[in-house]
């Protein structure tokens, strides 16, 4: 990614302090279990280690570390029974979910040969789960429980931990980067309008405003011909260009991409929402004609770029890129009632990482429908198979909400006039899907990603403390 971020996960373990002097062998046992557990956390996150906690004071010290680090998530390993005062001081002042990991060392007891310290050390992690949740509820803390076993490995536990860490990375990306708004939303698309201060207060995402005049001149000082040539080749490697492509043909586009990449790094931008509604002449027309593929090159590198000035879909694109590896702007395009499928897609910039069915294409059109000027269109080709859609919307009080659905992309004819589009079948049927999706009140844009990701999106929503409408899965 052009702007790298790394989630910060607070990790600690708890045990009842009264057990340790009674059964001293529990000390090395718990130290070994905790060390092994920390190794299960993916290296994509920064671990803030609160240690093994057996007293209120140790719990408070862990909480101080978590607050100082501004953790995105807390993961708590339950080693054996423990009282909730070992946990609550560590999380009392945090506004992030607490994931309780109840992993038992042994798959099953050896009933006849199990003594008290063996039971406490290897078989009793489940003892306090309910107590912890009860007190997290009373403290108003969001929470989740993962139950499993250490012996023999437990892929389900590992998958859940990885999922939560992916979700935490979304929070860190929103907090540590910025959104660039260039111009303003498409006139009259009031579903896209947004209060940027409310956005920052509720979703931690700061908006930087940029004028088009700065964008027109952004490449004026780009003179490194080797960098431009390398980027031109990158463009040719990314797209099949109608009529053939050469380095010379995409030279100016490559200059802009080099400039935009530097701008993204300098301004720490992970989201772009842009729309130009002026005259497509001179330098304005030049950039406007090649902006779609130029921004597609940014999307490829992790910066979500949304057309029509849609900040909310830029966020949805970034979420899916972070958790699923791709994020493609889409909208309801058409319905094939004969086949009972929805045609979903959009014009404009897209994500090459979703285009695994074939290489993305680029062609020149004389007019961008509904917009100023003409120029290069890009079309991406999502594969047949599972697909997830995510939209972000708001209620009348400004609270955000996620709207999600899972479906399956099917083979068959698609539109070929230059816009990305796919044939999606939903379990509830096309007619019912459109009714349910629309009634949820999303913006008319959504983001798409290959695979099924609702479970991860639910974790992202838990971290952001926003509701989710699950339309179908």
Model-derived regions: residue spans:
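Cap/lid and interdomain-hinge subdomains that line or gate substrate/regulatory clefts
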Residues: 2, 6-9, 107-232, 236-239
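Short beta-strand elements in bilobed, periplasmic/extracellular small-molecule ligand-binding domains
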Residues: 31-55, 142-148, 205-211
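Periplasmic-binding protein-like
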Residues: 71-80, 99-101, 269-275
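Long, internal scaffold/assembly segments composed of regular secondary structure
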Residues: 231-323
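C-terminal catalytic subdomain
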Residues: 296-416
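Extended hydrophobic packing segments that form well-structured cores
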Residues: 370-473
């Amino acid at each position: 990614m052009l702007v790298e971020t790394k989630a910060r996960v607070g990790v600690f373990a708890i045990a009842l302090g009264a057990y340790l002097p009674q059964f001293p062998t529990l000390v090395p046992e718990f130290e070994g279990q905790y060390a092994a557990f920390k190794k299960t956390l993916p290296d994509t996150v920064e671990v803030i280690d609160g240690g093994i906690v057996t007293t209120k004071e140790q719990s408070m010290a862990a909480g101080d570390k978590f607050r100082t680090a501004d953790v995105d998530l807390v993961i708590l390993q339950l080693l054996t029974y423990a009282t909730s005062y070992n946990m609550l001081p560590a999380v009392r002042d945090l506004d992030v979910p607490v994931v309780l990991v109840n992993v038992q060392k042994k798959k099953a007891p050896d009933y006849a040969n199990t003594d008290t310290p063996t039971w406490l050390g290897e078989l009793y992690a489940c003892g306090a789960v309910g107590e912890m949740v009860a007190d997290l509820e009373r403290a108003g803390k969001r929470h989740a429980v993962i139950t499993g076993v250490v012996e023999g490995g437990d892929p389900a536990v590992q998958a859940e931990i990885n999922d939560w860490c992916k979700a935490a990375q979304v929070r860190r990306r929103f907090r540590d980067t910025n959104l660039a708004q260039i111009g303003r939303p498409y006139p009259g698309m009031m579903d896209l309008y947004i209060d940027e201060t409310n956005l920052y207060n509720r979703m931690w995402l700061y908006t930087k405003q940029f004028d088009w005049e700065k964008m027109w001149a952004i490449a004026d000082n780009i003179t490194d011909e080797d960098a431009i040539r390398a980027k031109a080749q990158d463009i040719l490697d990314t797209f099949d260009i109608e009529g053939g492509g050469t380095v010379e043909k995409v030279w100016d586009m490559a200059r802009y991409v080099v400039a935009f990449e530097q701008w993204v790094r300098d301004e720490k931008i992970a989201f772009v929402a842009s729309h130009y509604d002026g005259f497509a002449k001179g330098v304005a027309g030049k950039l406007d004609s090649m902006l779609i593929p130029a921004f597609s090159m940014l999307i490829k590198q992790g910066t979500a770029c949304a057309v029509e000035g849609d900040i909310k879909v830029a966020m949805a694109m970034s979420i899916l890129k972070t958790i699923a590896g791709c994020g493609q702007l889409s909208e309801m395009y058409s319905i094939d009632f004969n086949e009972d499928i929805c045609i979903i897609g959009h014009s404009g910039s897209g994500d090459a990482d979703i285009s695994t069915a074939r290489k993305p294409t680029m062609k020149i059109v004389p007019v961008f429908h509904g917009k100023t000027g003409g120029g290069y269109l890009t079309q991406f080709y999502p594969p047949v198979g599972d697909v997830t859609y995510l939209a972000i919307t708001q209620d009348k009080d400004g609270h955000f909400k996620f709207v999600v659905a899972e479906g399956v992309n099917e083979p068959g004819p698609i539109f070929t006039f230059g816009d990305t589009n796919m044939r999606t079948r939903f379990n509830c049927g096309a007619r019912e899907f459109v009714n349910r999706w629309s009634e949820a009140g999303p913006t008319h844009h959504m983001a798409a990603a290959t695979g099924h990701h609702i479970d991860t999106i639910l974790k992202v929503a838990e971290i952001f403390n926003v509701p989710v409408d699950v339309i179908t899965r």
